[in-house]
């Protein structure tokens, strides 16, 4: 009954596989399966053209063209509501009557350039911005992973409030959770997760491990590019996101550390918090909405070795603070980043978009109400 109801909404799921967006894709494809969505992976469309445009310094155009091709495939397959990630793939989406877009993102191109130290869009910039404004005028709903991102959308593109929706990403708190009977190791276990070691500040973590004061502390480096180091460095190169081995390792650790130099809303910080780990992290992008400074961890203004060394020492010397902030981290995720909360918001937005492209008949209204109610019962029964 639930599946039949939600299949009446012809949903296209068009997703990006860059960095943490692979995790968004994987979880959505599983947790939105009741819609039987038409699934399209952006990188499968116009891959060669995207690589050519990137080679000649027009990476943003390549991403937009690939997004357009994937969205076109979804429309040709009958999709009326297209859930698309990310904003960088959305500017050239086909704006057809009877089709509505929902675009999920974590930063604008301006934030991307400023936060990640890249170049601005240059000559195509005004055209790309104009296309995003056309998307806005077409009725697109913009899902925002953080308030930081939503504020930028409002300021840069004057998007009205009724087309903006805060939607923090989620973790399954039944999978990502503290160990029930955690064995306390005499050696504290510190966790770092990051694919791009330089951008994520791994050099600072390696330097911390070399300090004599931390010789009895174990540092776990989860990255396909993790390198060997002193004996208390433990590289984990083969762990994949959402794998049981990664969940197990995370729940076995005591503290999460991420001296990131450029970020938006890192999912690893959410997963660590769900497992009851406080964090020492740099306040980039929307991170302050994930880690509450002084409550669920410590948010530092810059990626400086001295600052991270001092904070790590403070946590290791104060077991009550370490445990207390870990409990608060778990509670913060339960309240703000649970699968139930994320899905209830997302189903409501999808239903709203579906209504906007169909005749406002009683049948459609009943379908939408039934879809929301059925989904709420399903998600609530899962927690």
Where are these regions (language model features)?
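Nucleotide-activated donor-binding/catalytic signature segment of Leloir-type glycosyltransferases, i.e.
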Residues: 223-249
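Short hydrophobic beta-strand element within catalytic cores of glycosyltransferases
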Residues: 278-281
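Aromatic "clamp/platform" in nucleotide-sugar-dependent glycosyltransferases that forms part
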Residues: 261
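Conserved acidic donor-binding segment of nucleotide-sugar-dependent glycosyltransferases
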Residues: 293-294, 298-305, 314-319
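Membrane-proximal helix-turn-helix segments that form the acceptor-binding/catalytic region
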Residues: 121-142
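A charged, aromatic-enriched C-terminal amphipathic alpha-helix characteristic of glycosyltransferases
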Residues: 61, 320-351, 355-357, 363
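Carbohydrate-associated surface elements
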Residues: 148, 170
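Conserved donor-binding/catalytic core segment of Leloir-type glycosyltransferases
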Residues: 143, 182-200, 206-210, 219-220
């Amino acid at each position: 009954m639930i599946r039949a109801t939600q299949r009446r909404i012809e949903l296209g799921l068009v997703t990006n596989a860059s960095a943490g967006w692979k995790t968004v894709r994987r979880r959505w494809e599983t947790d939105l399966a009741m819609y039987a969505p038409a699934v399209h992976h952006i990188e499968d469309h116009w891959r060669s053209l995207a690589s050519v445009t990137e080679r000649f310094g027009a990476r943003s155009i390549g991403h937009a063209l690939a997004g357009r091709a994937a969205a076109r495939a979804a429309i040709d397959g009958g999709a009326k509501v297209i859930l698309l990630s990310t904003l960088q793939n959305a500017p050239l989406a086909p704006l057809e009557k009877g089709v509505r877009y929902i675009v999920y993102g974590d930063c604008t191109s301006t934030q991307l350039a400023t936060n990640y130290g890249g170049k601005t869009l240059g000559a195509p910039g005004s055209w790309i911005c104009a296309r995003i404004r056309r998307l806005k005028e077409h009725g697109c709903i913009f899902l925002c992973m953080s308030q930081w991102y939503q504020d930028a959308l409002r300021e840069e593109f004057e998007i009205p409030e009724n087309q903006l929706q805060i939607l923090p990403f989620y973790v399954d708190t039944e999978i990502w959770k503290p160990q029930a009977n955690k064995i306390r190791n005499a050696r504290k276990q510190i966790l770092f997760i990051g694919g791009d070691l330089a951008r994520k500040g791994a050099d600072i973590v390696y330097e911390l491990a070399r300090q004599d004061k931390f010789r009895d502390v174990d540092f776990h480096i989860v990255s396909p590019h993790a390198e060997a180091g002193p004996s208390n460095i433990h590289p984990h190169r083969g762990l994949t996101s959402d794998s049981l081995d990664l969940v197990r390792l995370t729940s076995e650790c005591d503290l999460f550390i991420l001296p990131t130099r450029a970020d938006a809303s890192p999912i690893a910080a959410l997963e660590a918090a769900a497992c009851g780990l406080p964090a020492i992290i740099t306040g980039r992008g929307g991170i302050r909405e994930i880690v509450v400074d002084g409550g669920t961890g410590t948010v530092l203004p810059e990626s400086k070795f001295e600052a991270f060394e001092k904070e790590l020492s403070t946590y290791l010397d104060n077991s009550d603070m370490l445990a207390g902030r870990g409990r608060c981290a778990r509670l913060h995720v339960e309240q703000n980043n649970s699968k139930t909360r994320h899905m209830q918001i997302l189903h409501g937005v999808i239903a709203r978009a579906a209504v906007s492209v169909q005749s406002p008949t009683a049948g459609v209204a009943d379908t939408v109400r039934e879809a929301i109610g059925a989904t709420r019962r399903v998600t609530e029964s899962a927690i």
